[in-house]
């Protein structure tokens, strides 16, 4: 327990942080779940193992360079069993010898003098260093919030200059690109020995013009037709001698570094006797903009992933062993898996400086992952990913066609990372986000980029390519294409992107880069666009493989959070803080957009799905649950109306005087929403509230629609088909005051009589007690008392009374709760939307950081409560 207490740190605003795993939890139950989880237990066991190994190990130096691990093992076995010997393979100046037990180690240290081959050995205890987690990566959603980056962007004259500056801070330096070329040349030389005629092609971030510091090195090993005798092609041209000498990495280090043993790992950087490379190096920056401010040189041993320093030396690999392994594998596994294993064996035994080789045959595109020790690069090799090579070249062509593409993509990638929208699992990949930006630029008026179909028609004779049955033809030279006539500034394009994505129908349409338009999912389309395509909450078609939805992994929650975050950003982009440089030294332009989101702001963008029911009944029940079951004081509310009659409507993107009006923005968004959804969707309530949390804007009215300053919030009438709810004569509890729901119903009936029905409802709620903590225990106790009194099963009214009683008990009152005079514990806005039948909860005042716990409780409690009502 003492060790656990040392690993756990209590946070000043509530919650706990596990210093071992670098994980933050909101409460004690979440902490207990983490401490009992696989990741934490694995690191605890690994730390104990490393400590035990250190107590059994000695540091040995002074032996000749030709001494190998077998000779050291034989010498130290005179004192007792030897568990392992790890040699310094780069210089051969020291070794770490792990004895079988602590007693044997003490016997070694008690020997006054050690001699091997006429040389006196220096033997001393291995220095113990503090354990560091092997997975000490930067946290998810890390954003460029360093003082240096803030200063660099704040000094730019306008938003466009900030975006260009961000590209310079994030992209690879020339030395880093040269280093990657050297690694590719090394791979080409080795693989040619096994597969004459093969070609190693880099793809992905390394060549698509959107590279960042520390990005992986993706390689495609093109084996061609190995059955035919072909002359071996020349390896990729290595950099000239002058350029190689100018590089911070001596090219001889790549060619002369001894091959790493299978699965071997370098000594841990926790040791003071860490390896010292002959080449000058410093840390390669990770994939965050902060890294651009560091030195643009090579990785130091301290920046490499930690590994166990006690690995048995298995000797040098050679070509014969790799071929023997390939022969053995070919009889046991399929041809594809056997070839993948052979590539892994070649990387382990024959490529200098490569370690941590892992084959992943179960991936969508099977790969072999590896790490390269001298350069600090991580990468993978694939055998059947020719399509990705053409995708990378297509992205590079797009960046060459217009100089605004790269700043826009870099900015939006950085923004999405800070909002927790991009990454692995159910999040958007960088590739999907880049394609989303390109599709947006194709749909401008006039277009910034041509469609894939237009590029295919302009492909020359030598540029006609077909891969796996898909047409990948497009010009390779951007200079032969006409430039775009669209001259909009970067700041305007960024604001338009946020506004348009927030109103696109991501589920009901397929965003096609080949056609440059949104194709309705329910329509009849040619089979070549649909065969094998997996639809989901977000549908974004690959430009060449038309059966691949690059956003198929995105969940409905992430898609909703993407659109809510875009709407919040669009609202901010209409403010003066975005448009003009602050004279008071405040963050302006891109800086508020790139700040990392707090857990509360991420949750506020996550909608809570509501059960299917007529919207007016649903909102009435929702207000009843908030007020009576949970004891929320509803201070005020707003409603949004929709007109059952047609007619001209003012664009939600409009406004005068102090609001920025984006040319072309209203037209594209309005037309897209009317064509794809049949109605106009507005998120301005949610967006304003999110920017209150994320940007810190001072908003006097807690909810307002775009309109003229000083005027009351404008009621946006949304054009919808007349539905069942619009004729029911009930609007849900807007404008609630002391009179309760009756007053709200009266007002809504009058408006319904004028042909207007409700579209969304919002309430401002205040809580003075933590009514979500201990609720299950209190409910169980009340249910037990009810059974003892002989009462039957509870109906709707009885259920509501029980929940109200639970709330009163949690508040420590015996009668109906009355509002205390102290400040509320938590204030939030609950906004119900009829568009997607969801509820968005946004914190307004949360001094103790309780909103994540409340939001987690509401996600489970509210849908169940509404079903009971």
Curated annotation (Swiss-Prot):
Its cofactor is Mg(2+); Mn(2+). It comes from the Eukaryota. Keywords: ATP-binding, Magnesium, Manganese, Metal-binding, mRNA processing, Nucleotide-binding, Nucleotidyltransferase, Nucleus, Phosphoprotein, RNA-binding, Transferase, Zinc, Zinc-finger. It is found in: Nucleus, Nucleolus; Nucleus speckle. It comes from Ailuropoda melanoleuca (Giant panda). Poly(A) polymerase that creates the 3'-poly(A) tail of specific pre-mRNAs. Localizes to nuclear speckles together with PIP5K1A and mediates polyadenylation of a select set of mRNAs, such as HMOX1. In addition to polyadenylation, it is also required for the 3'-end cleavage of pre-mRNAs: binds to the 3'UTR of targeted pre-mRNAs and promotes the recruitment and assembly of the CPSF complex on the 3'UTR of pre-mRNAs. In addition to adenylyltransferase activity, also has uridylyltransferase activity. A zinc finger (Matrin-type) spans 16-46. Pfam families: MTPAP-like_central (PF22600), PAP_assoc (PF03828), RRM_1 (PF00076), zf-met (PF12874). UTP binds at residues 216, 218, 391, 413, 431, 548. Phosphorylated by CK1 in the proline-rich (Pro-rich) region. It catalyses: RNA(n) + UTP = RNA(n)-3'-uridine ribonucleotide + diphosphate; RNA(n) + ATP = RNA(n)-3'-adenine ribonucleotide + diphosphate. ATP binds at residues 205, 391. Associates with the cleavage and polyadenylation specificity factor (CPSF) complex. Interacts with CPSF1 and CPSF3; the interaction is direct. Interacts with PIP5K1A. Belongs to the DNA polymerase type-B-like family. This is Speckle targeted PIP5K1A-regulated poly(A) polymerase. Residues 597-869 are annotated as: KA1. Mg(2+) binds at residues 216, 218. Adenylyltransferase activity is specifically phosphatidylinositol 4,5-bisphosphate (PtdIns(4,5)P2). Residues 56-128 form the RRM domain. Residues 279-290 have a biased composition (Polar residues). GO terms for molecular function: ATP binding; enzyme-substrate adaptor activity; mRNA 3'-UTR binding; poly(A) RNA polymerase activity; RNA binding; RNA uridylyltransferase activity; U6 snRNA binding; zinc ion binding.
């Amino acid at each position: 327990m003492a060790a656990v207490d040392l690993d756990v740190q209590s946070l000043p605003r509530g919650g706990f942080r596990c210093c071992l795993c670098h994980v933050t939890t909101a409460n004690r139950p979440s902490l207990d779940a983490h401490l009992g989880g696989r990741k934490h237990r694995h690191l605890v066991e690994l730390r104990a193992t490393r400590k035990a190994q250190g107590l059994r190990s000695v540091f040995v130096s002074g032996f000749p360079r030709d001494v190998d691990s077998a000779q050291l093992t034989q010498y130290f076995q005179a004192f007792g069993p030897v568990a392992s010997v790890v040699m310094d393979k780069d210089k051969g100046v020291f070794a770490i010898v792990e004895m079988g037990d602590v007693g044997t180690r003490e016997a070694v240290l008690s020997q006054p003098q050690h001699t091997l081959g006429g040389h006196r050995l220096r033997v001393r205890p291995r220095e113990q260093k503090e354990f560091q987690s092997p997975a000490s990566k930067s946290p998810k959603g890390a954003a460029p919030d360093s003082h240096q980056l803030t200063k660099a962007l704040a000094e730019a004259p306008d938003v466009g200059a900030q975006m260009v500056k961000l590209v310079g801070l994030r992209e690879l330096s020339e030395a880093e690109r040269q280093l990657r070329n050297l690694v590719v040349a090394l791979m080409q030389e080795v693989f040619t020995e096994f597969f004459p005629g093969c070609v190693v092609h880099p793809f992905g971030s390394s060549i698509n013009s959107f590279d960042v510091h520390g990005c992986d090195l993706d390689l495609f090993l093109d084996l061609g037709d190995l059955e035919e005798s072909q002359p071996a092609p020349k390896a990729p041209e290595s950099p000239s001698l002058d350029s190689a000498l100018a590089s911070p990495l001596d090219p001889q280090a790549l060619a002369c570094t001894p091959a790493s043993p299978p699965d071997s790992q370098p000594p841990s950087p926790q040791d003071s006797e860490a390896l010292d490379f002959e080449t000058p190096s410093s840390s390669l920056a990770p994939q965050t903009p902060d890294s651009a401010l560091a030195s643009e040189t090579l990785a130091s041993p301290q920046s490499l992933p930690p590994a166990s320093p006690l690995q048995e030396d298995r000797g040098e690999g050679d070509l014969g062993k790799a071929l023997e392994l390939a022969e053995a594998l070919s009889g046991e596994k399929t041809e594809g898996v056997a070839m993948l294993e052979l590539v892994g064996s070649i990387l382990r035994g024959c490529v200098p400086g490569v370690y941590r080789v892992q084959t992943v045959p179960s991936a969508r595109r099977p790969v072999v992952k590896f790490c390269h020790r001298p350069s600090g690069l991580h990468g993978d090799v694939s055998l059947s990913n020719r399509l990705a090579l053409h995708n990378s070249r297509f992205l590079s062509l797009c960046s060459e066609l217009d100089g605004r593409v790269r700043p826009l993509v870099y900015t939006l990638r950085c923004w999405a990372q800070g909002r927790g929208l991009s990454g692995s699992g159910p999040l958007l990949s960088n590739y999907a986000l880049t394609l989303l930006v390109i599709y947006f630029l194709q749909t401008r008026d006039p277009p910034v980029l041509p469609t894939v179909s237009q590029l295919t028609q302009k492909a020359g004779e030598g540029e006609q390519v077909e891969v796996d049955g898909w047409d990948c033809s497009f010009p390779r030279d951007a200079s032969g294409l006409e430039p775009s006539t669209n001259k909009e500034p970067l700041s305007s394009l960024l604001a338009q992107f946020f506004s348009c994505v927030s109103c696109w129908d991501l589920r009901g349409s397929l965003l096609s880069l080949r056609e440059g338009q949104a194709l309705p999912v329910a329509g009849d389309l040619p089979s070549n666009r649909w065969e094998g395509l997996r639809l989901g909450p977000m549908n974004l078609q690959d430009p060449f493989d038309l059966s691949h939805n690059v956003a198929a992994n995105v969940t409905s929650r992430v898609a909703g959070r993407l659109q809510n975050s875009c709407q919040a950003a669009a609202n901010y982009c209409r403010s003066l803080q975005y448009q003009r440089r602050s004279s008071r030294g405040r963050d302006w332009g891109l800086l508020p957009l790139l700040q990392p989101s707090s857990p509360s702001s991420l949750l506020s963008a996550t909608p809570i799905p509501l059960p299917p029911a007529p919207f007016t009944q649903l909102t009435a029940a929702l207000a009843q649950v908030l007020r009576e079951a949970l004891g929320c004081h509803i201070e005020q509310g707003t409603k949004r109306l929709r007109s059952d009659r047609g007619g001209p409507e003012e664009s939600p993107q409009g406004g005068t005087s102090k609001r920025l009006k984006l040319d072309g923005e209203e037209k594209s968004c309005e037309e897209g929403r009317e064509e794809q959804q049949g109605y106009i969707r507005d998120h301005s309530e949610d967006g304003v509230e999110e920017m209150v949390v994320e940007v810190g804007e001072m908003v006097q009215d807690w909810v307002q629609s775009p309109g003229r300053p000083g005027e009351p919030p404008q009621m946006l009438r949304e054009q919808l088909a007349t539905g069942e709810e619009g004729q029911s004569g009930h609007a849900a509890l807007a404008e609630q005051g002391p009179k309760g729901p009756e007053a709200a119903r009266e007002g809504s009936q009058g408006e319904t009589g004028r042909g207007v029905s409700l579209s969304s409802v919002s309430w401002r709620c205040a809580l003075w007690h933590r009514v979500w903590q201990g609720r299950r225990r209190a409910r169980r106790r009340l249910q037990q008392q009810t059974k003892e009194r002989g009462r039957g099963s509870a109906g709707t009214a009885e259920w509501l009374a029980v929940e109200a009683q639970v709330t009163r008990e949690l508040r420590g009152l015996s009668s109906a709760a009355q509002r205390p005079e102290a400040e509320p514990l938590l204030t939030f806005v609950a906004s119900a939307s009829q568009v997607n039948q969801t509820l968005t909860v946004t914190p307004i005042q949360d001094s103790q950081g309780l909103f994540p716990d409340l939001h987690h409780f509401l996600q489970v409690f509210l849908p169940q409560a509404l079903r009971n009502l």
